[in-house]
């Protein structure tokens, strides 16, 4: 098959199946690195590829899933050697049938900043090395799979796009709740990957065909029509013995439903064998892929928050230094705490997007905007509007943004369009076009509409579709140009209905220089919404403005069943009073006000600097133990409960833990200064078992346990059973946590548990990892199975207090 045939959708394209279980079944020993199979057992590896090719696979994934520098450290071989040998084995098999060879790339095994410690550009470099090696070795395409972190996937896509000219396939793994391990939604994945230039997108691993089907349907609706969708499910769900519950016939029968939803490529993942692919080939070969009918929608996103701009959407305006001395000083000082608190406050007030501007004379705008984006991504899950016309600042901010942002802005000048539109296209961003040019802002609606037409045409020519174009017809102050308000609204309405794009306005500009600005702002906002305004850049902390937005959504059926309106105002009492000027004002009483515990709120929000300051303040009035038990632990519990319920996601959980750690440092310092002994709730030993180099889950467990007051000895990854036994013996730990991600290393987990039992140590063992289930954990001798870090903390509290 020629690589171009993969995309023509004339027939189904067949991917291969599982590799790890095949290697294990054909002689790979526990602890042996699967990535080295091409060097240590090339005949076996080639035979596996050949079996898949003979079963009908059109694309063979080379055995390079973990062939990166981090995972190959200490193995005695370079990335280039391993990748080249692996591609050669796959190519030898592919040549017998004409199949294509994919450079298979999996996750690096570490969380990226801010959730972890791996920098975005460091992840990029790791992927780039593998991709260059794969391209040099003759791979036909790059296949990024089993990703759970959208930020890591972005680094990998950029590495592929910038270091080779091969097609790029991307695939993420979703849990049963419809989100990845880090909380990414199907829609956020779809629009981000497609926006970055992925040639095909898909879903693999974690679940079986039946469970993945609804997520694949959402994926097909969310990617552009020209981007193929593929699926590679597991062979059903895992059994207690590590096998899977579907045979080839059952697998193919469940997979057949995908033929009708727009998927055009099918294959298998864990537990599938050449027999599964052969049966899949037999089932799908007579069929033709159904047309994929995506929904063309305007949207912005972060991994966990997908904002569809289908009606009035609020953009918080407070992170803009214009006229804000406190923010100006914070930007000059490099103080991230203040803009972060502004971000959190706007989110809680109802903003759905945050405008971020670092344009201040005397500072490095590019460096400041880049750092602001990093800092804000750590504390809020709202999409960002990158407010700059500086190409360097936008390039740096767009590169490290996690998701799909919007750029504010371009104007009608060709030079600006030529510099900024390609950046928006490269990074998959939406763009705001200002209806002005070198002649300034036209006084009439016709003049502004003409500029908008030029902007839309230029954006379309750059490959940016109408749904990603937002036109700002510009709000002029009523005090200076009173007739301008009507012209703005007329131009806005024409852009919305004649050009088929979205609209945006900075609403508050209308009232500059006039008294009682809130009256004008609210009235103009209502008029603009009626004219077709989509993005309202405004202060969400103004109750009257948010009330107008929420009421408008109810009256235009955007807020179905008035759900959001009722949630906001069910407990609000309206009081009408007379001011000194005899003007009636409305005060909202009983709205959700922040509680009196500043430390609790800072930890809950994940604000590190505020948590430290609140702890310092609390310690001047309260005993350290009281601060821990009344503020810190309840805050962590609240965030943990949200995580269990699916309302809080991994990044927020880790940010709360980081904020709590900052508070704990203040508490430790207070205890040390008082000369009091610092007690521990108990000692826990944790490790990733021998042969496994994945430690994301283990590291998260460590952070959470430490913040609950336990002494945690982290032995790292690829840990021998003897080291675990010795650590427990030396520390007297009563609880041991073992982690494994790969099926090939679960036997080493069992060996470690057996070694602990043989040593007659008085400890309990909890285990976790993607390949484990409660039944499987029991079968290998573990005392407890913990599905996540919160479960580990709950167990520690149960056993150790």
Roles of regions detected by a PLM:
Residues 1-801:
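Domain-level signal for soluble alpha/beta catalytic cores
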């Amino acid at each position: 098959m020629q690589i171009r045939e993969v995309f023509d959708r004339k027939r189904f394209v067949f991917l291969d199946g599982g590799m790890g279980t095949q290697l294990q079944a054909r002689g790979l020993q526990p602890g042996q690195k699967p990535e080295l199979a091409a060097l240590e057992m090339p005949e076996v590896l080639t035979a596996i590829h050949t079996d898949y090719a003979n079963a009908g696979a059109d694309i063979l994934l080379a055995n390079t899933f973990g062939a990166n520098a981090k995972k190959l450290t200490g193995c005695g071989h370079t990335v280039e050697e391993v990748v080249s040998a692996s591609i050669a084995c796959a190519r030898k098999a592919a040549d017998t049938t004409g199949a294509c060879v994919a450079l298979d790339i999996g996750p690096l095994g570490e969380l990226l900043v801010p959730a972890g410690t791996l920098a975005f550009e460091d992840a990029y470099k790791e992927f780039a090395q593998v991709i260059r090696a794969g391209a040099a070795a003759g791979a036909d395409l790059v296949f990024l799979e089993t990703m759970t972190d959208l930020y890591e996937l972005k680094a990998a896509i950029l590495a592929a796009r910038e270091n080779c000219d091969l097609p790029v396939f991307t695939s993420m793994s979703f849990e049963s709740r419809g989100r990845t391990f880090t909380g990414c939604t199907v829609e956020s994945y779809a629009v981000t990957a497609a926006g970055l230039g992925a040639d095909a997108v898909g879903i693999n691993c974690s679940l079986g065909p039946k469970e993945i089907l609804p997520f694949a349907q959402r994926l097909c609706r969310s990617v552009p029509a020209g981007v193929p969708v593929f699926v590679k499910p597991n062979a059903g769900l895992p059994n207690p013995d590590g096998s899977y519950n579907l045979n080839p016939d059952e697998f193919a029968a469940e997979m057949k439903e995908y033929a009708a939803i727009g998927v055009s490529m099918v294959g298998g993942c864990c537990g599938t064998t050449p027999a599964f692919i052969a049966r899949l080939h037999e089932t799908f070969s007579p069929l033709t892929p159904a047309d994929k009918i995506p929904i063309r929608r305007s949207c912005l996103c972060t991994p966990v928050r997908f904002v569809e701009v289908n009606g009035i959407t609020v953009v918080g305006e407070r992170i803009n230094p214009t006229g804000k001395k406190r923010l100006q000083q914070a930007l000059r000082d490099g103080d991230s705490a203040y803009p972060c608190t502004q971000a959190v406050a706007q989110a809680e007030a109802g903003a759905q997007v945050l405008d971020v501007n670092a344009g201040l004379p005397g500072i490095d705008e590019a460096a400041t905007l880049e750092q602001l984006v990093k800092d804000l991504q750590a504390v809020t899950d709202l999409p960002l509007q990158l407010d700059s016309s500086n190409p360097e600042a936008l390039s740096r901010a767009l590169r490290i943004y996690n998701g799909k942002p919007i750029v504010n802005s371009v104007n009608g000048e060709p030079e600006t369009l030529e510099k900024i539109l390609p950046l928006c296209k490269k990074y998959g961003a939406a763009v705001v076009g200002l209806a002005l040019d070198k002649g300034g802002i036209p006084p009439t609606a016709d003049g502004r509409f003409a500029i908008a037409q030029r902007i839309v045409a230029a954006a379309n020519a750059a490959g940016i579709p109408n749904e990603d174009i937002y036109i700002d017809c510009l709000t002029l102050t009523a005090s200076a140009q009173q007739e301008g308000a009507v012209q703005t609204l007329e131009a806005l309405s024409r852009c919305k209905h004649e050009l088929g794009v979205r609209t945006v306005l900075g609403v508050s500009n209308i009232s500059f220089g006039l008294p009682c600005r809130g009256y004008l702002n609210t009235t103009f906002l209502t008029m603009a919404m009626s004219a077709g305004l989509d993005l309202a850049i405004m202060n969400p902390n103004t109750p009257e403005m948010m009330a107008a937005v929420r009421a408008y959504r109810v009256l235009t059926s955007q807020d179905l069943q008035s759900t959001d309106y009722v949630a906001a105002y069910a407990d609000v009492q309206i009081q009408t009073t007379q001011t000194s000027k005899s003007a009636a004002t409305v005060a909202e009483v009983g709205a959700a006000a922040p509680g009196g515990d500043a430390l609790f709120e800072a930890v809950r929000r994940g604000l590190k600097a505020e948590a430290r300051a609140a702890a310092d303040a609390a310690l001047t009035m309260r005993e350290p133990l009281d601060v821990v038990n009344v503020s810190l632990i309840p805050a962590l519990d609240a965030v943990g409960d949200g995580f269990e319920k699916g309302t809080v996601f991994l990044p927020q959980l880790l940010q709360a833990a980081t904020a709590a750690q900052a508070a704990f440092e203040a508490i430790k310092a207070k205890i040390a200064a008082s000369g009091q002994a610092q007690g521990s709730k108990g000692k826990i030993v944790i490790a990733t078992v021998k042969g496994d180099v994945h430690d994301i889950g283990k590291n998260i467990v460590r952070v959470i346990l430490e913040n609950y007051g336990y002494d945690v000895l982290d032995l790292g990854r690829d840990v021998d059973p003897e080291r675990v036994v010795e650590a427990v013996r030396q520390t007297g730990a009563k609880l041991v946590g073992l982690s494994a991600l790969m099926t090939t290393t679960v036997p080493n987990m069992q060996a470690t548990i057996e070694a602990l039992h043989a040593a007659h140590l008085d400890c309990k063992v909890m285990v976790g990892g993607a390949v484990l289930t409660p039944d499987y954990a029991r079968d290998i001798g573990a005392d407890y199975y913990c599905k996540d870090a919160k479960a580990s903390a709950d167990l520690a509290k149960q056993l150790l207090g």
